[in-house]
C-alpha cells in the first residue's frame, strides 16, 4: 500500500510541477488583453525598458535578469494551451487510476476487519512454516557438521 501511496505522491508532484511550468509559460507568453472601457497598462518589462532608456546614467547596474523568451504567435499560444490542458487531464486520470486501485475503496469497515483477520491467520501459518523450516535447517546443519567432524577424525 505504501508503494501505491508513494506512486500517488510522485504523480501529484509531477502534476504540480507541470502546472507550475505551464503557468510560467502562460505568464510569459500570454498576449496582453485590454478589458473593454479600460486603457492598456504597461507590463513590468516595458516599464523597466522605458525607465532605462530615459535615464541611462541614473540607473545603477542591476543584476542580469533571465532573458525574456521570444514571443510566440497567438495561434501557437492557443495550441500550447490545448496541449497543456491535455497533459493535465492525462496526468489527473493517472492519479485517479492509482487512487481507485487503493485497497479499501468501496469496502465496508467490517469487510476490511475480516480481511485483516484472514491475513493475520495466513501470516501466523506462514510464520509456523518458517519456524519449522528453521528447525529443520538446524537439524540438517548439525548432521552435516557431524559428518564433517567424523571424516576429519577418521583420517
Curated annotation (Swiss-Prot):
Cell membrane in keyword set: no
GO cellular component: mediator complex
Domain of life per record: Eukaryota
Stretches with biased composition (Basic and acidic residues): 39-51
Localization in the cell: Nucleus
Region (Disordered): 29-73
Residues in coiled coil: 75-147
Keywords: Activator, Coiled coil, Nucleus, Transcription, Transcription regulation
Matching InterPro entries: Med7/Med21-like, Mediator_Med21
Family, as annotated: Belongs to the Mediator complex subunit 21 family.
PANTHER family cross-referenced by the UniProt entry: MEDIATOR OF RNA POLYMERASE II TRANSCRIPTION SUBUNIT 21 (PTHR13381:SF0), RNA POLYMERASE II HOLOENZYME COMPONENT SRB7 (PTHR13381)
Complexes and interactors: Component of the Mediator complex.
Name of the protein in question: Mediator of RNA polymerase II transcription subunit 21
Upper taxonomic lineage: Eukaryota, Fungi, Dikarya, Ascomycota, Pezizomycotina
Amino acid at each position: 500500500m505504501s508503494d501505491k501511496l508513494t506512486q500517488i505522491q510522485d504523480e501529484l508532484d509531477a502534476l504540480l510541477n507541470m502546472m507550475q511550468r505551464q503557468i510560467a509559460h502562460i505568464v510569459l507568453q500570454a498576449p496582453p488583453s485590454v478589458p473593454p472601457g479600460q486603457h492598456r497598462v504597461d507590463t513590468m518589462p516595458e516599464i523597466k525598458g522605458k525607465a532605462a532608456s530615459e535615464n541611462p546614467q541614473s540607473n545603477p547596474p542591476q543584476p542580469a535578469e533571465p532573458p525574456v523568451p521570444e514571443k510566440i504567435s497567438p495561434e501557437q499560444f492557443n495550441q500550447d494551451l490545448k496541449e497543456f490542458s491535455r497533459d493535465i487531464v492525462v496526468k489527473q486520470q493517472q492519479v485517479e487510476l492509482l487512487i481507485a486501485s487503493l485497497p479499501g475503496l468501496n469496502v465496508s469497515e467490517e469487510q476490511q476487519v475480516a480481511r485483516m483477520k484472514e491475513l493475520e491467520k495466513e501470516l501466523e501459518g506462514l510464520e509456523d512454516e518458517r519456524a519449522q523450516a528453521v528447525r529443520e535447517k538446524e537439524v540438517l546443519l548439525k548432521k552435516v557438521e557431524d559428518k564433517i567432524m567424523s571424516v576429519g577424525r577418521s583420517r
